[in-house]
Each structure stands twice: as C-alpha cells, then as structure tokens.
Amino acid sequence: MLILTRKVGESINIGDEITVTILGVQGLQVRLGINAPKNVSVHREEIYKRIQAELAPNQDPQ
C-alpha cells in the first residue's frame, strides 16, 4: 500500500484520468473530491461491499 501525506487543497493523480483532491479535514474525518471518467465507478467501501454481496448470488459458478 502506498501511503501519501497531503494538505487541504492538494491532489493525488491515479493514472492519467483520476484525480483525488483533499477538500477538508475535521477531526478524524477527511473530505475527498474525486474526478474520474464516467465509465469508472467510485463508491465508498461499505457501498461497494453491499453491491458485491447483492451480485454474488446472481453470478454463475465457473
């Protein structure tokens, strides 16, 4: 895992098309802004896990 330190207003680029910007920090909470192409799904982890759990019973075993 790559660990980076950023200040409010600074960004991290992922590849050529994704930018994550630190918008604010309050206590233990960090606000992120994410710019990504429309074909790239961006979800909070708990939402992503819920989506995967809902899809799992519908997938055919291979």
Curated annotation (Swiss-Prot):
Main location: cytoplasm
GO molecular function: mRNA 5'-UTR binding
Localization (cell): Cytoplasm
Claim: Heme is one of the keywords in the record: no
Keyword field: Activator, Cytoplasm, Repressor, RNA-binding, Translation regulation
BP terms from Gene Ontology: mRNA catabolic process; negative regulation of translational initiation; positive regulation of translational initiation; regulation of carbohydrate metabolic process
SUPFAM superfamilies tied to this protein: CsrA-like
Pfam families cross-referenced by the UniProt entry: CsrA
One of the record's GO cellular component terms: cytosol
Protein function: A key translational regulator that binds mRNA to regulate translation initiation and/or mRNA stability. Mediates global changes in gene expression, shifting from rapid growth to stress survival by linking envelope stress, the stringent response and the catabolite repression systems. Usually binds in the 5'-UTR; binding at or near the Shine-Dalgarno sequence prevents ribosome-binding, repressing translation, binding elsewhere in the 5'-UTR can activate translation and/or stabilize the mRNA. Its function is antagonized by small RNA(s).
Family listed: Belongs to the CsrA/RsmA family.
NCBIfam families according to UniProt: csrA, PRK01712.1
Quaternary structure and partners: Homodimer; the beta-strands of each monomer intercalate to form a hydrophobic core, while the alpha-helices form wings that extend away from the core.
Protein name: Translational regulator CsrA 3
Species: Pseudomonas syringae pv. tomato (strain ATCC BAA-871 / DC3000)
Organism phylogeny: Bacteria, Pseudomonadati, Pseudomonadota, Gammaproteobacteria, Pseudomonadales
